[in-house]
Amino acid sequence: MAAATADPGAGSPQVGDSSGGATGCGLPSPGEQELSRRLQRLYPAVNQHETPLPRSWSPKDKYNYIGLSQGNLRVHYKGHGKNHKDAASVRATHPIPAACGIYYFEVKIVSKGRDGYMGIGLSAQGVNMNRLPGWDKHSYGYHGDDGHSFCSSGTGQPYGPTFTTGDVIGCCVNLINGTCFYTKNGHSLGIAFTDLPANLYPTVGLQTPGEIVDANFGQQPFLFDIEDYMREWRAKVQGTVHCFPISARLGEWQAVLQNMVSSYLVHHGYCATATAFARMTETPIQEEQASIKNRQKIQKLVLEGRVGEAIETTQRFYPGLLEHNPNLLFMLKCRQFVEMVNGTDSEVRSLSSRSPKSQDSYPGSPSLSPRHGPTSSHTHNTGADSPSCSNGVASTKSKQNHSKYPAPSSSSSSSSSSSSSSPSSVNYSESNSTDSTKSQPHSSTSNQETSDSEMEMEAEHYPNGVLESMSTRIVNGAYKHEDLQTDESSMDDGHPRRQLCGGNQAATERIILFGRELQALSEQLGREYGKDLAHTEMLQDAFSLLAYSDPWSCPVGQQLDPIQREPVCAALNSAILESQNLPKQPPLMLALGQASECLRLMARAGLGSCSFARVDDYLH
């Protein structure tokens, strides 16, 4: 339309007019679910909890001549339309997040109305809504009556064709290079604006009676192939990353990478692989092989659910470690209680095989060792030793497959509490484990080792660098004992109902006794270090399992999922490394964390290239 001049006396937006009616609360409709899936596919780098995507027009950010309907996606004009002072606009609910990289929306012209004085574009928060987009500073629009583009000015520039009833106009914002182009009926019209600021809102404006438009923020497939355009820019950004110049420092760069890989292998216990890598690259290994294998063995025990044995082994190889880390010790004991409920800890699997020593002070007891009891000089370290979890249950509920743990072979001979001949228990090579232990001192450099052929794990099969040998009998996080009862008393609606400890009364009593001792340990730690809410929550969550006849199907049953052993395993492994003055996290993981944080900072700073340089794209 003809160029318009700014009118300082123009009216202000009306707040709270919801003539279109907002969608009601409750469960997401199928349409909303499909929208969420499409937006996630288009903009995977966007954290919608921090920076929500536009999904509709805002009933609180529009001029009073604008009416909304159909879920705030349809806009109609309800003013007089006498002149430019009657123009009215509406902004979307949220600005375009920089992490989109490329953002696109479409507007269908349902009716051009009397004159077709319509504008489609972008505007910043606070721009006057009594104007068409493009007429004011930080406002940009493409107008249908004359095909002109308006860039923060009342004077338009020739840009594209006019548009009318039935046309679909798209607006694409490139947050990487700060440009914007429009499409008409699926065809690009070329660059309209450059040097765009951040935090712009999709905006439409109408001026004459009868004008109606519908927005598509992803509710329906777009006419324009925006995903092809995104692929083009993703290739450009990734090409920039790949071509980053390092030739002048190539030798230094390679040495850094080799050290990062070596330390990662050592951290997670890939002993043989780390040794072979060090031999090929001449990279020194900071930790002795014996210590690596000791950590590997401890991790293996934790991931199998044999936490009592893991505690005893840790105390043997690294005396004083757990007693100086009461939070870690308490977390391990709580996890042991959970595994006793699960039926995987040797305390309930091998009741009849405990030696006199273990009966007197068995490895599974929650009591602190008399030799290493905590003193007032010990620090109560909550952050370094315990991840944010309850009983080793990560705060983010994992949905990973429960069947990732291969079946164990036979009973353990490395611990007096696991020497049962139960067919479902796990062991190590006696010649490489038990015998060597008898003749070696209890230290972090003990030569108790298991042969590489038994203890080394293949990285592609065992994430986290530890052998995952949970029994294939694990179903939904529950250990199915040989004596699991499935008679009439354990049937529920014709389906087998799992019972605590397979219905074994002695094992159930052992769990209850262990729980009392665990409660006593909690009270002891409370007296020495003060009350810890995290400890209280761990204890409550663990004890809650006993309130249900089928703990695996109860509301807190996710604790029994084998995947929940991993944060406990990681915390213990990090504490061992830290006690040896080694990094508790491998430098490779720190570098990945730094890269991820840099990308988040780029998004907050409005640098759109962060969307196409995601760390996950480089992890294979």
UniProtKB/Swiss-Prot annotation:
Where is this chain primarily localised? cytoplasm
Source organism superkingdom = Eukaryota
Entry's localization field: Cytoplasm, Cytosol; Nucleus
Keywords, A to Z, come to: Acetylation, Cytoplasm, Nucleus, Phosphoprotein
Domain LisH: from-to ranges: 253-285
Q: Which SMART domains match?
A: CRA, CTLH, SPRY
Q: Which residues carry this modification: Phosphoserine?
A: 361, 365, 367, 369, 422, 451, 453
For the region Disordered, what residue ranges are annotated? 1-34, 347-459
According to the UniProt entry, which residues carry N-acetylalanine?
2
Q: Does the keyword Secreted apply?
A: no
Q: Which of the residues bear the PTM Phosphotyrosine?
A: 362
Q: Where is the B30.2/SPRY domain?
A: 35-222
Q: Where is the composition biased (Low complexity)?
A: 409-436
- Using the record's annotation, list all stretches that form the CTLH domain: 291-348
Cellular component terms (Gene Ontology): cytoplasm; cytosol; nucleus
Gene Ontology biological process terms, A to Z: cytoskeleton organization
Q: Which InterPro entries match?
A: B30.2/SPRY, B30.2/SPRY_sf, ConA-like_dom_sf, CRA_dom, CTLH/CRA, CTLH_C, LisH, SPRY_dom
Q: Where does the record place Polar residues bias?
A: 347-398, 437-450
User: Domain annotation text?
Assistant: The SPRY domain mediates the interaction with MET.
Protein task: May act as an adapter protein to couple membrane receptors to intracellular signaling pathways. Core component of the CTLH E3 ubiquitin-protein ligase complex that selectively accepts ubiquitin from UBE2H and mediates ubiquitination and subsequent proteasomal degradation of the transcription factor HBP1. Enhances dihydrotestosterone-induced transactivation activity of AR, as well as dexamethasone-induced transactivation activity of NR3C1, but does not affect estrogen-induced transactivation. Acts as a guanine nucleotide exchange factor (GEF) for RAN GTPase.
Quaternary state and interactors: May form homodimers. Identified in the CTLH complex that contains GID4, RANBP9 and/or RANBP10, MKLN1, MAEA, RMND5A (or alternatively its paralog RMND5B), GID8, ARMC8, WDR26 and YPEL5. Within this complex, MAEA, RMND5A (or alternatively its paralog RMND5B), GID8, WDR26, and RANBP9 and/or RANBP10 form the catalytic core, while GID4, MKLN1, ARMC8 and YPEL5 have ancillary roles. Interacts with RAN and RANBP9. Interacts with the HGF receptor MET. Interacts with AR. Interacts with TUBB1. Interacts with YPEL5. May interact with TUBB5. Interacts with DDX4.
* Family membership noted in the UniProt record: Belongs to the RANBP9/10 family.
Please state what the protein is called.
Answer: Ran-binding protein 10
Instruction: Specify the species.
Output: Bos taurus
| Encoding gene per record | RANBP10
